[in-house]
Design a protein with these regions (language model features):
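Short cysteine-rich clusters marking metal-coordination/redox-active sites
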Residues: 81, 129-132
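Residues immediately within or flanking Cys/His clusters that coordinate Zn2+
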Residues: 78, 126, 149
Length: 172
């Protein structure tokens, strides 16, 4: 936990209720239809993702800053949930926040749900994949204009698909 994260954590106030505003379709990942919410227990995903990814996604662990190859990575493409493959972010919205975690100015509409996290004494707004419920990261109010948001994501919880490759089918 670095100083920047401590300070920005204080500025992060409630934004949205959990899993509000679904707009993605399960059968058409980038379209504007609600995703089908999966009801699998965390154990369902154990053999489908790495041990490190599982801890982040289903035990809400946080990867060490600077540890993800996706942090300093700016190729064109889409960032999918590492568990269920729902597209969560586009490369156009990725930027270098200097925090050591992959950061985005906005998610794909409806791909994420948020809730307050009081784990660190002050509230932070954490967000989850709207389809499988996997924990991805936290959103802060110190992002670049005009949106002003920093969606701070664990790289290990993402799967990158280059723009010139087809998206894999959703799984789960
Ligand atoms: Zn997911």
């Amino acid at each position: 936990m670095n100083r920047r994260t401590l300070l920005t954590g204080l500025a992060s106030l409630p934004v949205l209720p959990l899993f509000s505003g679904f707009t993605l379709a399960a059968d058409s990942p980038l379209s504007a239809q609600p995703p089908t919410r999966l009801a699998h227990p965390p154990s369902y995903w154990r053999d489908k993702v790495s041990a490190e990814a599982w801890k982040v996604l289903f035990e809400e662990a946080t990867e060490r800053p600077g540890s993800s190859p996706l942090d300093q990575f700016y190729e064109p493409g889409n960032y999918l949930c590492a568990a269920c493959y729902l597209p969560l972010f586009r490369s156009e919205d990725k930027y270098d926040s200097g925090t050591g975690w992959p950061s985005f100015t906005q998610p794909i509409e409806g791909a994420l749900g948020t809730k307050l996290d009081f784990r660190l004494l002050w509230p932070r707004t954490e967000y989850h994949c709207a389809r499988c419920g996997g924990h991805q990261g936290h959103v802060f109010n110190d992002g670049p204009a005009p949106l002003g948001k920093r969606w701070c994501n664990n790289g290990v919880a993402l799967r990158f698909v280059p723009a010139d490759q087809p998206l894999p089918p959703l799984r789960g």
